[in-house]
Amino acid sequence: MRKAIFPGSFDPITLGHEDIIKRGIPLFDEIVIAIGVNAEKKYMFSLEERKRFIEETFKDEPKVSVITYEGLTIDLAKKQKAHFILRGLRNPADFEFEKAIAHTNRKLSKIETVFLLTAASTSFISSSIVRDVLRHGGEYEMLVPDAVRVKK
């Protein structure tokens, strides 16, 4: 079984995340969207809200499940018996950052990282940009799935 972990904080999930997941569905038998929890990080949306946004976005997709976790992604992948970590790349800076993590993960396990390039239409979107737009009362709706389109 080809099982992949798609990790992130998803604060909130964006159309870029959604695009990568949808394009990953034909590649894997199962995709586990793993919401990382970092006690030292301040989030705009609660863990419950972030999980609900993702579950609502993929409610009709049986190959997608959503979990939360603390600790190293590679440890979660092993625990979940996943052979792949799915990541999206928006730009060369993302690639350099993700490449170092992928090499480290490969040293620690047999788990492969699969990179998908973001679509040109979503490559400018990040959760931090969405949060900034929200904080300033801007129009954020075109950046996120329908499930997130609720003003804070």
Curated annotation (Swiss-Prot):
One of its GO terms (cellular component) is cytoplasm. It comes from Flavobacterium johnsoniae (strain ATCC 17061 / DSM 2064 / JCM 8514 / BCRC 14874 / CCUG 350202 / NBRC 14942 / NCIMB 11054 / UW101) (Cytophaga johnsonae). Homohexamer. Reversibly transfers an adenylyl group from ATP to 4'-phosphopantetheine, yielding dephospho-CoA (dPCoA) and pyrophosphate. Keywords: ATP-binding, Coenzyme A biosynthesis, Cytoplasm, Magnesium, Nucleotide-binding, Nucleotidyltransferase, Transferase. Its EC number is 2.7.7.3. The lineage of its organism: Bacteria, Pseudomonadati, Bacteroidota, Flavobacteriia, Flavobacteriales. This is Phosphopantetheine adenylyltransferase. Belongs to the bacterial CoaD family. It is found in: Cytoplasm. Pathway: Cofactor biosynthesis; coenzyme A biosynthesis; CoA from (R)-pantothenate: step 4/5. PANTHER family: PHOSPHOPANTETHEINE ADENYLYLTRANSFERASE. It catalyses: (R)-4'-phosphopantetheine + ATP + H(+) = 3'-dephospho-CoA + diphosphate. One of its GO terms (biological process) is coenzyme A biosynthetic process.
